[in-house]
């Protein structure tokens, strides 16, 4: 048995949801009559987050973040059925279950995360799922991680945060836990993988 705890990011890590996110943003931009550059927007949300993008739009155009977020969330929820699992996700989750590794999710996605997990048949793999509906301070602030550590008496030295953006790696650093990341390079705090099944090789 491997003494580890996995905390997973959701969008772009466990599921391929960026096409749905980009479509929801395009419709949101159109609704508020804003110029939409798909390449630039995709680059921005991969480097930062959708929330940061909407905050920038609020500052640039004077449209309230709440109105932008409400519209974008509605449009994304309407596209949740198009979200699919990332290759290797089930294999890694099954392996983690056999190794008695506890799994959690911490994502900026909203309350519809639960229904997506149910539809994809993976909700039972996770002890708890934290979303934006929990109202923790956003990544990379470690508040949500600290909540899980305290609630479940987790050992930080055993926790790995698995994500796909610099924001996820920064969260792990701020929370003083290990990082495995699909895009960020190797360093003393992070292990880079190119696909999820490489997680097995990290611990086998």
Cite the ranges covered by each PLM segment.
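Secondary-structure boundary/capping motif
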Residues: 16-17, 105, 114, 140
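N-terminal helical cap/lid subdomain that shapes the substrate entry/recognition surface
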Residues: 2-87, 91, 95
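Short glycine/serine/threonine/alanine-rich loop segments
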Residues: 34, 63, 101, 154, ...
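Asp-based, Mg2+/Mn2+-dependent phosphohydrolase catalytic module
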Residues: 1-4, 30, 94-97, 110, ...
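A generic secondary-structure micro-motif detector
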Residues: 15, 43, 82, 103, ...
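Non-catalytic, surface-exposed connector residues within folded enzymatic/regulatory domains
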Residues: 65-69, 83, 107, 138-139, ...
